[in-house]
Design a protein with these regions (language model features):
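PLP-dependent amino-acid enzyme catalytic core
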Residues: 1-406
Length: 406
């Protein structure tokens, strides 16, 4: 119904809190009535126990890339672990409270499926079904999904792209014959994903104690909407750069005020190869004051016809554009940046291609660079073997370092 609100004074009272304590305090208003605060605090600690660093996420002040928020220290080396580990623990608690098993259903362009399966496979009261586009995700991510050996995990390859997989999932949820099945979405349709991701925007502000722009590699707009959520919960920060690869539907939206579906094109950052940003509808729901009928009318002819936002009433769309800006880059830009900076910056050896969409786009004079730019590193490069193949032709020693064991 509404976002919980935190004053600046309350937010800064969490300055010395651990990440788990911060998450507990910020997210408990969403959970209150389902769990006690003590039980929720215990659940959060257990959920993040599988991360490789005690702080869960890490801010890294780099010489050449600026301030980078490392979100890849979870069990599948992708930012989705931060939300998925918490979501799976909450689903298990729900199954326990109702004494009924839950079927988790989701579609993935790579990161989501791997993280969801890893998070859910340990819970006997959860079965998980993940649809992924055949030969359109990285080989590493496909192996992560198909080699769990868990009896409650069911990965399914689907002909087409991510949008086709997601459409199958949406149809299953709507089919009348499935109304008695306890399906739960693992995609960012699930609010837990959004609320969990909002936490590290607060974490960043509390660590640097100054205004910042969050540069977010973007496909489905979930992460960007989590930043909007943090803003509506009371966090003050300058704005968000929606950084896209050559699948630039979101960039064209903010640049030209037109939302138009295009065919997804395979890229070196496959987790971002998405042509319909589902979470953008959430933002519109807020703009239209939670009027679902208006939103349904707006999307009645989409994607057959693009949606134009020039005629939104009042300052609603302009307020959105004041907070969100965007840009895009192609595969060549990503490769050139990696090659240019590889020997200068060790962090490049452990981050995936998606970071460079954020890095490149915020360094293209879109923003006032006197502000701190917080690039978000979403995954490790082992998820993107196309990078290895391309870089191998350019800088062989780069590939040797990237794939070498620790």
């Amino acid at each position: 119904e509404c976002f919980p609100k935190f004053s600046e004074e309350v937010i800064y009272s969490f300055k010395d809190a651990s990440y788990e304590e911060l998450a507990t305090n910020l997210l408990f208003p969403y959970i209150e009535g389902f769990l006690s605060k003590n039980d929720f605090e215990h659940l959060v600690k257990q959920a993040y126990n599988s991360f490789s660093i005690p702080e869960i996420v890490r801010l890294n002040e780099t010489k050449n890339l600026g301030l980078v928020l490392e979100l890849f220290h979870g069990p599948t080396f992708a930012f989705k672990d931060v939300a998925m580990q918490l979501l799976a623990a909450l689903l298990d608690k729900a199954a326990e409270k109702t004494d009924k098993k839950i079927v988790v259903l989701g579609a993935t362009s790579g990161d989501t499926g791997s993280a969801a399966i890893e998070a859910c496979k340990y819970f006997n009261d959860i079965n998980i079904v993940i649809l992924f586009p055949d030969q359109k995700i990285s080989a590493v991510q496909q192996r992560q999904m198909t080699t769990s050996n868990a009896s409650n995990v069911f990965p399914l390859s689907v002909k087409g792209n991510f949008d086709d997989s997601q459409n199958h999932v949406k149809k299953i949820f709507l089919e009348e014959e499935n109304k008695n099945v306890r399906f739960v979405s693992i995609n960012s349709i699930n609010w837990t994903r959004i609320m969990a991701q909002s936490v590290y925007f607060f974490y960043t502000k509390l660590k640097i104690e100054k205004d910042f722009i969050a540069s977010i590699p973007s496909g489905n707009f979930g992460h960007a909407y989590a930043g909007w959520t943090a803003k509506n919960m009371g966090l003050s920060f300058k704005g968000i750069n929606v950084a896209t690869n050559k699948n630039d539907v979101l960039h064209q939206l903010f640049l030209n005020n037109i939302y138009e579906q295009k065919e997804a094109i395979s890229s070196l950052a496959p987790s971002m190869d998405i042509s319909v940003a589902s979470n953008f509808e959430r933002l519109l729901f807020e703009i239209y004051e939670k009027d679902g009928k208006v939103l349904n009318n707006l999307f009645s002819s989409f994607p057959a016809k693009p949606i134009k936002f020039d005629d939104l009433p009042g300052d609603a769309w302009q307020n959105v554009k004041d907070f969100f800006q965007s840009s895009s880059c192609n595969d060549e830009d990503i490769i050139n940046t990696i090659v240019e900076n590889f020997d200068k910056e060790k962090l490049i050896r452990v981050i995936g291609a998606n970071l460079f969409t954020g890095y490149l786009n915020t360094r293209s004079n879109i923003f006032d660079l006197k502000l701190t730019i917080n690039d978000m590193a979403f995954s490790k490069p082992l998820h993107e073997e196309l990078i290895y193949l391309t870089l191998g032709e350019l800088v062989p020693h780069v590939v040797r370092v990237l794939i070498a064991p620790k």
